[in-house]
């Protein structure tokens, strides 16, 4: 039966005690990690969020009732213990931060009993993630998860302090917003008082932070909840946290400079990693040409080589055909892989096909000097030699080629480069490589919609030297946009914003909006722009992803207290869930027959379980 802690006051967390406290009377509280009865002496490992501390219960120190309670302790019981801190002498436990001491108990209260947990509460659990997430409140007790969330809290506190010291104001923006196009799918919230109308949950505070600059607030930041109704993967969630900032009277270099100092401080003070400044910069074009990606992992080489000029006149129709159709031929050199078995090469070909390749051409430069190739019979000896030389090929190398439209070639080789690096285990795990990628295209062409779409968003400023191309060649216009990359992950991105209403109107026009449509969606912003707008720019970090990389884990679910799974559901509280019919009627919502059937089938399955 649970006891009250009335009259007891916790004096320390477990790992706040050390040899300096020997002889003191203390009170600690927490969960029983494990209990061992050694015939008259009971050893209990007590756990709280700080760590573990050993407690000793012995008849000579505690009354009979207290010892009887200690005998009944089980894992995850919540207890309060008062006792004397003692040195463990020569029996130090090097595995514990408190391994040099223990507490000899003279009072105990059982504050709460526990059933046997569905999995052990221990570090590096092998328990299936589905079970862990169903009982997330137990999973959150595990030391490695607690470590991640404590780090998350420290990083958030550091960011707040740094930006406040830099003159930023923390200002909250609305959660219930107007739905606007040009982004991912919105989460919609029906309005009861405006039947048939909907709010949208924010995908970012973009418009409001720009309005704050119009309002004269100069430097704004917010650690904001954002929402996107999209398919999930390891580093995505339907609700996510963004470190959002905006600055007035600045250009690209100003935003980069303050964020470099923020990153340096953040990594040094939380995980002890030195970030060298200035961080390397690379244009979008260079990143794509060298790495096939706008978020390149620069911890290893294996860069792409453009061999279009070398093979534009050759006997291999796949190469020449791609070039004639406006594409290119590029390759990567997998050093030391010349002896790779055919089965593994075939697997790489299939991998390339997943990213749009029709195939993958290869040359094996074997250790004995033999050359094996999927296309050598179509090439002359001189053509093959020129191609191998262009790739820097040597004995023992495997050369892999893609020939297609540039978009496909980059996608295929960029992903193949990463896959090979993982297979060869050549990516240094303890290295943190930062990179700014700049000068993105302002637009990208959507074959599906047969129009230009904004690569970032419709409020991104074109580079001044490209403004005259907006009418004549929009596809070649570069944006004053920048992403910050860490080890092949985009951890943040931003841009200089358009602050002239004529350029903003031109941007909407190029995106296929009529003037009426633009004002219908963004009229409040465009009206605000008529009242004096400072030049402004900003940046936002994906906070969950940033902490994931700092913590060295593979999924952002490991750094979020209560995450969703891939179908955007919560396994712990079963959200989303059906709601009462009267709630829907109040909102003027009626379910389709198909939805009704799915709900009734789901209910039948649940009752069967």
Q: Can you annotate each of these PLM segments?
A:
Residues 1-609:
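Class II aminoacyl-tRNA synthetase catalytic cores and aaRS-like
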């Amino acid at each position: 039966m649970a006891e009250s802690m009335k009259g007891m006051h916790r004096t320390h967390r477990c790992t706040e005690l050390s040899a300096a406290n020997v002889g003191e009377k203390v009170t600690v509280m927490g969960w029983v990690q494990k209990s061992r009865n050694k015939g008259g002496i009971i050893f209990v490992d007590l756990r709280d969020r700080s760590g573990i501390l050993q407690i000793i219960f012995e008849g000579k120190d505690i009354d009979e009732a207290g010892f009887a309670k200690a005998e009944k302790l089980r894992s995850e019981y919540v207890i309060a213990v008062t006792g004397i801190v003692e040195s463990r002498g020569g029996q130090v436990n090097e595995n514990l931060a408190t391994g040099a001491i223990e507490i000899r108990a003279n009072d105990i209260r059982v504050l709460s009993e526990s059933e046997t947990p569905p999995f052990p509460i221990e570090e590096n659990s092998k328990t299936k993630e589905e079970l862990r997430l169903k009982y997330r409140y137990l999973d959150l007790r595990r030391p490695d998860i607690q470590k991640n969330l404590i780090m998350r809290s420290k990083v958030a506190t550091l960011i707040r302090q740094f930006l406040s010291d830099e003159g930023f104001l923390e200002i909250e923006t609305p959660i219930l917003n107007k739905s606007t196009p040009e982004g991912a799918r919105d989460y919609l919230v029906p309005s009861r008082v405006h039947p048939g109308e909907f709010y949208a949950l924010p995908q970012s505070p973009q418009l409001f932070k720009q309005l704050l600059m119009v309002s004269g607030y100069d430097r704004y930041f917010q650690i904001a909840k954002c929402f996107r109704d999209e398919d999930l993967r390891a580093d995505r969630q339907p609700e996510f946290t963004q470190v959002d900032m905006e600055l007035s009277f600045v250009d690209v270099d100003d935003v980069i400079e303050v964020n470099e100092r923020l990153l340096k401080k953040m990594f040094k003070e939380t995980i002890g990693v030195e970030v060298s400044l200035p961080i390397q910069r690379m244009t979008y074009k260079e990143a794509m040409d060298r790495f096939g990606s706008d978020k390149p992992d620069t911890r290893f080489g294996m860069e792409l080589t453009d061999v279009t000029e070398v093979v534009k006149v050759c006997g291999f129709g796949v190469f020449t055909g791609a070039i004639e159709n406006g594409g290119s031929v590029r390759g990567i050199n997998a050093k030391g892989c010349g002896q790779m078995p055919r089965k593994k090469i075939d697997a790489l070909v299939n991998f390339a096909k997943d990213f749009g390749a029709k195939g993958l051409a290869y040359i094996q430069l074997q250790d004995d000097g033999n050359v094996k190739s999927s296309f050598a019979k179509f090439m002359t000896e001189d053509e093959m030699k020129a191609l191998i030389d262009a790739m820097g090929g040597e004995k023992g190398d495997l050369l892999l080629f893609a020939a297609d439209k540039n978009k496909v070639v980059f996608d295929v080789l960029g992903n193949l480069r990463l896959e090979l690096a993982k297979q060869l285990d050549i990516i240094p795990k303890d290295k943190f490589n930062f990179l700014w990628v700049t000068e993105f295209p302002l637009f990208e062409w959507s074959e599906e919609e047969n129009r230009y779409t904004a690569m970032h968003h419709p409020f991104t400023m074109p580079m001044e030297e490209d403004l005259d191309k907006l009418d004549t060649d929009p596809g070649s216009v570069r944006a004053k946009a920048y992403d910050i990359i860490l080890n092949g992950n985009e951890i943040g991105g931003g841009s200089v914003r358009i602050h002239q209403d004529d350029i903003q109107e031109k941007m909407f026009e190029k995106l296929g909006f009529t003037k009426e449509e633009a004002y219908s969606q963004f009229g409040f912003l465009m009206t605000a722009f008529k009242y004096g707008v400072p030049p402004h720019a900003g940046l936002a970090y994906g906070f969950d992803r940033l902490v994931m990389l700092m913590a060295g884990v593979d999924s952002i679910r490991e750094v979020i207290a209560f995450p969703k799974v891939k179908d955007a559901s919560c396994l712990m509280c079963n959200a989303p869930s059906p709601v009462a019919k009267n709630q829907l009627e109040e909102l003027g919502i009626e379910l389709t027959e198909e939805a009704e059937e799915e709900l009734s089938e789901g209910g039948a399955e649940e009752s069967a379980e």
